[in-house]
């Protein structure tokens, strides 16, 4: 469902979403106490192949990269999915409604968990937390496991309540490239090969069509800021925190001042599909206390596939 043009324009003028309150993570002990409760849903954010090997009992699957559909991004003003499709996924397939408490987890590194977390928060799921340390920490502490296919859950009614202060559209990013006094664009991709354009990635155009990005490179003015700088557990090891502590995250922001960071700027984070490394950087900056952070969900999948959009001049 498309927003009317006026409503969309007003959405861009809304105040930024507040900084996170510190409850975006849940420890393994608290998560274990939630197993089996009727209004709790555990959601796996990595690939289904990994899921079938071992997962928390009763889990469903919402692989972060599959939540970004380029055709929907273009059709629905920057959303990773159009609202009707997202409602069907969240309520119909995942069995989540307004009263559901959701715990998202991945193997342990946290990037994909952040993508699914971001997707659910964006569409209005109120109670969503990430399992700190992911499956690796859960296993290390003897948490129960099962293998095989996702749980079959009853469909629930879910009405999206989109928070557009969480995202930036391609038009807003284009504006940001020419307004460094008010915007900072951060490229959260992990390698310089992606940033420079040597590496080209694939993503979903629609639910049944995968494409390879046509052009490599970066958005003009974007600062290389890999998500691993903010990660406490980039290798997915047991008993390591998903995110660095707020003081450590704030030090990373201090380092970015030489690249134009300022607390009053709108920071736009992107990666290849937005839901993953870009959303992890969003989560980290919010945890560090930055107010106006947005994910460009279209990310390089949209920008790199549009020949009318400029590329950064890189050495």
Residue ranges and their predicted role:
Residues 19-315:
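Cytosolic catalytic domains that perform sulfur/thiol-centered chemistry
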Residues 5-16:
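Bacterial N-terminal signal peptides
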């Amino acid at each position: 469902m498309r927003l009317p043009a006026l409503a969309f324009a007003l959405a861009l003028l809304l105040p930024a979403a507040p900084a996170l309150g510190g409850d975006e993570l849940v420890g393994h002990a608290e998560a274990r106490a939630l197993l089996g409760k009727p209004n709790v849903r555990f959601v796996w954010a990595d690939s289904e192949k990994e899921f079938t090997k071992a997962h928390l009992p009763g889990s469903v699957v919402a692989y972060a990269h599959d939540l970004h559909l380029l055709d929907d991004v273009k059709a629905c003003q920057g959303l990773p999915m159009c609202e009707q499709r997202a409602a069907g996924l969240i309520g119909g397939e995942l069995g989540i409604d307004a009263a559901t408490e959701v715990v998202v987890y991945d193997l342990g590194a946290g990037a994909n968990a952040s993508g699914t977390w971001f997707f659910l928060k964006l569409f209005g799921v109120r109670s969503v937390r990430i399992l700190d340390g992911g499956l690796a920490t859960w296993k290390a502490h003897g948490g129960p496991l099962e293998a095989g296919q996702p749980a079959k859950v009853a469909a629930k009614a879910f009405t999206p309540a989109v928070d557009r202060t969480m995202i930036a559209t391609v038009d807003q990013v284009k504006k940001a490239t020419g307004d460094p006094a008010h915007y900072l664009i951060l490229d959260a991709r992990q390698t310089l090969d992606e940033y420079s354009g040597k590496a080209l990635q694939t993503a979903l155009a629609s639910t049944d069509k995968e494409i390879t990005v046509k052009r490599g490179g970066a958005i003009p003015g974007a600062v290389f800021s890999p998500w691993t700088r903010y990660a406490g557990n980039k290798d997915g090891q047991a008993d390591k925190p998903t995110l660095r502590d707020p003081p450590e995250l704030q030090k990373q922001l201090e380092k970015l001042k030489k690249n134009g960071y300022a607390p009053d700027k709108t920071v736009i984070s992107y990666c290849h599909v937005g839901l993953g490394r870009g959303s992890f950087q969003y989560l980290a900056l919010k945890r560090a206390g930055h107010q106006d952070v947005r994910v460009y969900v279209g990310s390089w999948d949209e920008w790199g596939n549009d020949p009318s959009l400029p590329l950064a001049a890189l050495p």
